[in-house]
Amino acid sequence: MSDVTIASESERKFERRKWFEIVREVKINLIVMFSNPDFITREHFEITSIEEAKNLMFEFSLNSEVSKEEEHNSENLYHKPHKMCRDEFVLFRKQPLPQPSGTDYFSKISDEIILCIFQWLPKTSLVRCSRVCKRWRDLSYDESLWKRYDYGRKKIEPCVLEILLHRGVSILRLAMSELKSPVFSEEFLQGPQWYSSLQYLDLSMITISPENLAILLSVCIHLKKLSVENCELNDDCCRNISQNRQLTVLNMAMCTGITPEGLHAICVNCEKLVEWNLSWTNLTTECIEACFPFMPTTVERLNLSGHRETLDDYGLIEALQRCPNMIELDISDCALLSQHSFEVLVKFCPNLEHLHSSRSYHIPAECNRLLKQMKNFKYLEVFRTLTDKSLASLREYMPDVQINQHVFSTIARPTTGVRRTSIWGLRTRDPSV
């Protein structure tokens, strides 16, 4: 081997040793690329000095560290990766928010004035106002703006009612709505006991299971007027109803699932009950025996229509003896009642003003003349019980009494007449502007 060949190999080994030292200094695994004897890679980067090689190695080390960090962050889906770059490049820049021009007049007026403005807005506009700023959010959620709400004929999504009750609604109409399960979230049910501000609640013909209805009624202890017409009940529902000690009006017309225990709890605890509608509830003899002897003495308007085979003279007399202040009574479609019930009615209820006895065929027509003894008696409904001749004779005998003027009973019903969006005379919808 010639001396020239030996010299070139020694120079190549010497230069290769320098490259190993450079790579070792920057701690990067690029030995293979820079130990190539033909130096193609070096010529591509136009490396002419060791100083330039060090700078190039430093750039490769940064890229390697960035790739390792991105690989590590990709394992965590909740970690937002950030990119490293040179000082002369900017990948992300936060745009400054445009500053509003002009005068903010709302900052110069008090919260009370803003609330007076907000009270004329519908609920959908209030929700939009709550997204403007923190101050508007607090004001738009004020309880004075959410006293009444009409959710009738709507499909209510799960847990929406929980949000609505927390805003302080006291007058709520849910008639003919569909309330989807669950009514309340798990966090709410497992948290500390909380009670709503509801005082007037209309649940007539609502689509809901008895279990969910019991959960809804469990947070209501301040109710004054309640309607659960045409709902399926259970013992838990009745017990939750009975915890409303200030309840004065209760509409249970056409309800199913009523038990003697549930009725007894309502009679014992709701001592301020004034109007009670139990029509067409298919009360059994056990229910009547558990309820009527304990009927609240404050009841003035009572609807017992539709009990064709269970309500007899004995049961009605027990109820009448407990309610001396009876003003309106509906005993229509009670086929077992006789003249004896009528005589007790005239004796124990001297303040009676309105009587419904339609289709009670076992009550003789002559018993209606006994009602003339009552000084305050004004209205009598006897549809399909008297002939035209008997009806004309009765009108001549009692000229001051209006006969067959009211087709339907309004006892404890939340919505009557043309006021279809009001419950018990209270407005539920937003004012029109």
Model-derived regions, located:
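A generic tandem-repeat structural signature
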Residues: R173-A265
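C-terminal capping region of solenoid repeat domains
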Residues: S2-H79, M84, P100, I113, ...
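Solenoidal tandem-repeat scaffolds enriched in leucines and small polar residues
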Residues: K224-D312, L316-A319
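Inter-repeat linker/turn residues at the boundaries of leucine-rich repeats
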Residues: K134, S144, R167, Q193-S196, ...
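Amphipathic alpha-helical protein-protein interaction segments
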Residues: Q95-S110, Q119-C129, K154, D202-I206, ...
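Conserved hydrophobic beta-strand positions in leucine-rich repeat
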Residues: Y149, L172-A175, Q199-L203, L226-V228, ...
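N-terminal adaptor-interaction module of cullin-RING ubiquitin ligase components
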Residues: S2-P192, Q199, A214, R239
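Short, solvent-exposed loop/turn at the beta-strand->alpha-helix junction
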Residues: K154-C159, E178-E186, I206-N212, C231-C237, ...
